[in-house]
């Protein structure tokens, strides 16, 4: 019996435990699902996360910086973000899916959005590439959601919000109509809900140089992006 247990541990349990420890306290990879981080990230990209760093931040050691791309779960109070299916397959439970967004505000920052322009502590957010990309296609600068800094529709007229301790204000790079559901809707995200920072895009290896998004605010925009241009090497560091 002991021999069987040792064999089971060596052949099955040990690799599984090692994999769990590696992904929880080492590094793991996640896929980008959707178009909310265009143009920086495209649907189907796979990102590498140093999960050990995420654990350190949750324990109060260091923190995320403005511009970091993070993977997190939306706040528990954001009921509309809870899911009961996975890729169309019904599940007997509800869960909060992981999202990928960019850190815009860190604890203590004051966030204000006017005419689509994000300001942090009174200074315009430096995002020239993002603004240039969406101004070329379909930047949303007028809708209430695009200019909200509140956690509920009834508070959308708040002129600004101060990020609480141990929390972060996150936004998607997609500034088209309905392009990203983020802290403009559900408010700042507690550090305990942030898994880690994405540091590298590792897949696919090759991609088309240009991506043209749909601008109708319709569902599943990631399925309607048009790719063109030459092929280029995709793996790259994700710098703030």
Question: Predicted segment positions?
Answer:
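Soluble "head" domains of membrane/secretory-pathway proteins
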Residues: 2-10, 25-31, 39-240
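Hydrophobic alpha-helical membrane-embedded or membrane-associated segments
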Residues: 11, 15-19
